[in-house]
UniProtKB/Swiss-Prot annotation:
This is GTP-binding protein RHB1. Belongs to the small GTPase superfamily. Rheb family. Keywords: Acetylation, Cell membrane, GTP-binding, Hydrolase, Lipoprotein, Magnesium, Membrane, Metal-binding, Methylation, Nucleotide-binding, Prenylation. Pfam families: Ras. InterPro entries: P-loop_NTPase, Small_GTP-bd, Small_GTPase, Small_GTPase_Ras-type. Its main location: membrane. One of its GO terms (cellular component) is plasma membrane. PROSITE patterns: RAS (PS51421). Mg(2+) binds at residues 30, 48.
Length: 209
């Protein structure tokens, strides 16, 4: 299943970035992405093999074509699809705030990324999904505090503190911090890359090869 939508702005200079969402099964990676790309909430859960999405967003007077790779749910022993990750410039690590195991898996996934890609300086953000359930009256208990998420984020990324992961919580159902999640990653990418390669001649640098 693939989704694609494009929204234009009055920007005159374009650039392109590929990012990937990585996390355990059923943490809401696809739901988050569909909310961002199509502005709708997908309630049913269908295990993802791999999906690709595209959205054009305005960023600092430019049009950014954001290619979003929604990866299959991971566990301790699964291997990442390195071929699919070719060209990825930023990573969104996802866990559910109502699923402790998905949170505990994050350091394992990050180490797996570093080992398989051979680099730890990729722009990365840590995202706690399903924030609406943690504060609802549906009888669902929050299993991971915001403070725990912030602490974990501080341990992810390269040894250069400027490249440490940023942290945010979001809810696809309530459309809470969804746009902000992807913009936060763009800011992380800009910080690492310098200018985000807005000049056409720099547009294809700094990718995973």
């Amino acid at each position: 299943m693939e989704y694609a939508t494009m929204s234009s702005s009055n920007s005159t200079h374009n650039f392109q970035r590929k990012i990937a969402l990585i996390g355990a099964r059923n943490v809401g990676k696809t739901t988050l992405t569909v909310r961002f790309v199509e502005s709708r909430f997908v309630e049913s859960y269908y295990p993802t093999i791999e999906n690709e999405f595209t959205r054009i967003i305005p960023y600092k007077s430019h049009d950014c074509t954001l290619e979003i790779l929604d990866t299959a749910g991971q566990d301790e022993v699964s291997l990442l699809n390195i071929k699919s990750l070719t060209g990825v410039r930023g990573i969104i690590l996802c866990y559910s705030i109502i699923n402790r195991a998905s949170f505990d898996l994050i350091p394992i996934l990050w180490d797996k990324l570093v080992d398989q890609l051979g680099k730890d300086n990729l722009p990365v953000i840590l995202v706690g999904t399903k924030a609406d359930l943690g504060r609802s009256t549906k009888g669902v208990k929050r299993c991971v505090t915001k403070a725990e998420g912030e602490k974990l984020a501080s341990t992810i990324g390269s040894q250069d503190k400027r490249n440490q992961a940023a942290f945010i919580e979001c809810s696809a159902e309530l459309d809470y911090n969804v746009e902000e999640t992807f913009m936060l990653l763009l800011k992380q990418m800009e910080r690492v890359e310098g200018t985000l390669g807005l000049d056409a001649e720099n547009n294809n640098k700094c990718s995973i090869m």
